[in-house]
Curated annotation (Swiss-Prot):
Family: Belongs to the class-II aminoacyl-tRNA synthetase family.
Predominant localisation class: cytoplasm
GO cellular component, one term: cytosol
Cellular localization per UniProt: Cytoplasm
Catalytic reaction list: tRNA(Gly) + glycine + ATP = glycyl-tRNA(Gly) + AMP + diphosphate
Extent of the signal sequence: none
Assembly information from the UniProt record: Tetramer of two alpha and two beta subunits.
Name of the protein described by the UniProt record: Glycine--tRNA ligase beta subunit
EC number: 6.1.1.14
A GO MF label: glycine-tRNA ligase activity
Length: 690
């Protein structure tokens, strides 16, 4: 027999961002607990609101299965001493089964007698096992916790009630002074408490008390109501998934409504209005049918439609107060010339161990000028870069960014446009911060891409130079995000940048032109290069390359992210080709021979020492590949496919480790040339070949 089991934790209002994760945690911990205790079930459904975390275990077995089995113990000669007394081994064996030595009997197995016991145990009732739900609640973790009363216990918010029903039977789980029963609470203002006759009554009973316990159903209600409202007015709304999730977890009974504000505020940049509405008030911004932001917003009330006019008026009043502040900041900032703000950056600390923001910008310009030449950026774009690198952080000291820190770069773009900076310069100010997350948008302009890379590269160099290097668990200055941003932009632009090769030149250029500490030696420079190169692995994982392909390409000495990605594409593309296995096996054989011989010297090859035509053929083939300076990774692989029979013939026709030392070293030098070329693709020995 099976029954459904309902368990609800009723709390004070929880922060919206923890609700979904917390109910999932409750379900996962319960699932593990039930499996460990041998209680079978069909599935676990979750319900959650700001005031409750609930699970419904479907078709839970009413008891554990009875145990009726024979357990084998130690051999008789170990279970008893020579006088027939029970040893500690025998006593430990029966103790583990909950039995005594009187229960032991012996049977022969393959010529040896062993101790056995016949274990018969009635399974525990589910109601007894479910009393352990209190331990599950105690074990739950949260980003922040609260204590209440005099209890030595923490939870996300104080617990006021619990429901624990196995079918129609109360399982009186106790936590602190709260004993679980069958009474749950409806909406704080619209509903009453409700007594549940059965676990299956939960969802419908709460609906009668203005609580939609199913989060997906609440989300669907919100979306449907928004769509109805939008259709009535010919509006458009961009549904932000994060905001939708948040408002879903802010309400128990959603009612969508629309409000408005004076059109005069539309002179403020859209991003300011959207931030005021979305981030501060949890409103959805509204657009007309042409995609232009208009003076309306959509919000969600935690309740029904009664007195909705009062709710709308209250929300409009709060928003207008915020927009008045934004208008004031916007007007104040426009009173001053750009130079007024730029000059202030001399007194704004980038970091107390690194210097001012103005010094950071100066270093960024040096780095960008150097990289611009490497990337063949046009003279016109370099002129724009030099201009924007002089000013791009100016909005940090504006009133608007002081109030809305998340708009740094965005406000710089708008203010730059207002004073007549060209579009390349204006947009690059905003794009210097891109990408703002692992999946964030990348710069759309060459100048923006160059500025963003230079900014991030200086940040990494400066913090590493000052000894503030991220640990495996701590990265307070988001240096990994900066490094990953560099990699993503390089790949997006198709810019070749062998990090380890250019760092010494860059640091030399910066020396003497900054008060910030710089990496002091080649080891420190290599640490930075490896840190950035490690982010290439992240990109390869995002693009879902096979793990062995990733391991292979990252084990090469290649420093250029573009070339590493090209190698991954090539190896992945040809992985299932008929000629892939023989090519990889030939090249791996070369690597293994060189390792065994401990041969690393790049000696010149003496053609006069060749003793077989196969040596001449390999020499010519490798030279042809080496001399093609524009050879792509894809073409290099094709070259090795064509060269594979030549390599095989070389092995068949020559004793590599010849008795003649000169001949041996000459042949090893030949193989080293091949190996160095193959290393451009990766360490092929790491590939899994089927």
């Amino acid at each position: 027999m099976t029954k459904d089991y309902l368990f609800e934790i009723g709390t004070e209002e929880m922060p919206a961002h923890v609700v979904s994760k917390s109910v999932k945690q409750l379900a996962d911990r319960t699932k593990k607990y039930l499996k460990e205790n041998g209680l079978s079930f069909k599935d676990i459904k979750t319900y959650s609101t700001p005031r409750r975390l609930t699970i419904l275990v479907e078709d839970l077995a009413e008891k554990q299965e009875d145990i009726d089995e024979v357990k084998k113990g130690p051999a008789k000669k170990i279970a008893q001493d020579k006088d027939g007394n029970w040893t500690k081994a025998a006593q430990g064996f029966v103790r583990g089964q909950g039995m005594t030595t009187d229960d032991i009997y012996f049977e022969e197995l393959k010529g040896t007698e062993y101790a056995y016991v016949h274990v018969q145990k009635e399974g525990k009732k589910a109601s007894d096992i479910l009393m352990g739900m209190s331990d599950i609640v105690k074990a739950m973790t949260f980003p922040t916790k609260m204590r209440w009363g005099s209890y030595d216990f923490e939870f996300v918010r104080p617990i006021h009630w619990m429901v624990s029903l196995l079918g129609s039977e109360v399982v009186p789980v106790k936590l602190l002074d709260v004993v679980a029963g069958r009474k749950t609470q409806g909406h704080r203002f619209l509903g009453d408490s409700v007594v549940l006759a059965n676990a299956d009554d939960y969802e419908e009973a709460l609906k009668s008390q203005y609580v939609i316990a199913n989060a997906d159903e609440r989300k669907g209600m919100i979306l449907n109501q928004i769509q109805e409202l939008v259709a009535q007015h010919n509006w458009k709304v961009n549904i932000d998934k994060g905001l939708l999730e948040e408002v879903t977890n802010l309400v128990e009974y959603p009612t969508v409504f629309a409000g408005s504000f004076d059109e005069k505020y539309l002179n403020i940049p859209d991003e300011v209005l959207i931030t005021s509405m979305k981030d501060n008030q949890r409103y959805f911004e509204v657009y007309d049918e042409n995609g232009k932001l208009i003076n309306h917003f959509i919000s969600v009330r935690n309740g029904n439609s009664e007195y909705l006019d009062n709710v709308i008026a209250g929300n409009e009043k709060v928003l207008v107060a915020r927009l008045d502040d934004a208008q004031f900041f916007y007007d104040e900032d426009k009173k001053y010339p750009l130079a007024h703000f730029v000059d202030k950056l001399k007194n704004v600390s980038f970091h107390d161990k690194i210097g001012s923001v103005a010094e950071h910008m100066a270093r960024v310009q040096i780095i960008g000028d150097y990289l611009g030449k490497k990337f063949n950026v046009s003279d016109t774009e370099m002129k724009d870069f030099d201009r924007v690198s002089d000013i791009y952080k100016f909005d940090l000291v504006t009133s608007m960014v002081g109030e809305f820190a998340e708009l740094q770069g965005v406000m710089g773009m708008h203010y730059a446009r207002l004073i007549g900076e060209n579009e390349n310069v204006s947009v690059a100010i905003k794009e210097s911060y891109m990408p703002t997350s692992a999946e964030g948008d990348l710069p759309s302009t060459t100048v923006g891409s160059l500025l963003s890379i230079a900014d991030k590269l200086d940040t990494i160099i400066s913090f590493f130079g000052a000894g503030m290097i991220p640990s495996s668990s701590n990265d307070p200055y988001a240096l990994r995000r900066n490094a990953y941003g560099i990699v993503r932009i390089l790949l997006n632009e198709g810019w070749s940048l062998p990090i380890k090769d250019v760092l010494p030149e860059l640091i030399q250029l910066l020396s003497g032109k900054t008060a910030a500490k710089l990496p002091k030696d080649a080891e420190a420079e290599n640490e930075i290069a490896d840190f950035i190169r490690d982010r290439v692995k992240q990109q390869l994982q995002v693009e879902k390359y096979d793990y062995d392909v990733i391991d292979a390409v990252l084990a090469s000495s290649q420093q250029d992210p573009i070339q590493i990605l090209a190698a991954a594409k090539t190896l992945q593309m040809h992985h299932d080709d008929a000629d892939f296995k023989p090519v990889v096996e030939s090249l791996t054989r070369i690597t293994n021979i060189l390792k065994k011989a401990k041969y690393r010297n790049a000696n010149d090859i003496d053609e006069s020492l060749f003793q077989d035509v196969s040596e001449e053929e390999l020499y010519a083939g490798v030279n042809a590949l080496e001399e093609n300076t524009d050879l792509s990774i894809a073409d290099l692989y094709k070259g090795f496919v064509e060269l594979q029979p030549v390599i095989n013939n070389y092995f068949e026709s020559n004793m590599i480790l010849d008795k003649d030392e000169k001949v041996k070293n000459n042949r090893l030098a030949q193989l080293l040339k091949v190996n160095n070329l193959a290393d451009r693709m990766g360490d092929l020995s790491k590939l899994v070949i089927k």
